[in-house]
Regions:
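Hydrophobic alpha-helical transmembrane segments of membrane transport/permease proteins
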Residues: 1-18, 34, 112-128
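Membrane-water interface segments at transmembrane-helix boundaries in multipass membrane proteins
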Residues: 86-147
């Protein structure tokens, strides 16, 4: 009874809800049901460094892998690399992140024993969870960059650049890829809150 009174569970649901909303407006998110001696805000602050580290590492992995892969898929459209990557993108998009995480833990962590499956503190502990979180985003941005580049390749400025005699590498990187990155950068920026909220440790 004392615990119910401390947590406010003896009040009607709507009263508890409005008390919680009013508390949130003042920065008070209530008391943790898991550990009543701690506040929810305190628990969030305690987990924030690890959460930001995981989200930041995942974001770097997304950028480092999706941009060059999407670029190569567009340049070598319908080639063997493009077909393989499109197949992998289709498979990874269809697989939920928790299932991918379990497969990676079982294969890389348990069977091969290359990386730790739990714990925190070193860069090796970040690889599996970061890659698991990043995988679905990588698939999304590979498709986005590839499609944007293929669309930009049809634009008039590419024809003019070829007429001017610019090197093909310069046209691809300085013009097509640069113009294709605008929507991708916006999408990546919009996915940061989702990335952080989805990686709360």
């Amino acid at each position: 009874a004392a615990m119910e009174e401390q947590l406010g569970l003896n009040k009607p649901f709507f009263v508890r809800y409005f008390d919680w909303v009013l508390g949130c407006l003042h920065g008070d998110f209530g008391i943790s049901y898991v550990n009543p001696k701690r506040t929810v805000a305190g628990e969030l602050l305690r987990c924030l460094p690890a959460t930001l580290q995981l989200a930041g590492t995942s974001f770097v992995i997304v950028a480092v892998l999706s941009i060059p892969i999407g670029f190569l898929c567009a340049v070598y459209k319908d080639g063997w690399f493009d077909k393989i990557m499109r197949g992998l993108v289709f498979v990874t998009t269809a697989m939920p992140a928790y299932w991918v995480g379990l497969l990676l833990m079982w294969g890389i962590g348990v069977k091969l024993n290359w990386l730790p499956t739990n714990g925190n503190g070193t860069w090796r502990h970040l690889i599996l969870p970061s890659f698991t979180v990043a995988l679905s985003y990588i698939s999304t941005y590979i498709r986005l960059i590839r499609n944007n580049m293929l669309e930009n390749m049809k634009q008039d400025y590419v024809l003019y650049a070829n007429v001017r005699g610019l090197p093909q590498k310069a046209i691809l990187v300085k013009h097509i890829l640069k113009n294709s990155m605008h929507t991708c950068i916006v999408a990546m920026g919009m996915s940061i809150p989702q990335l952080i909220s989805g990686t709360i440790v």
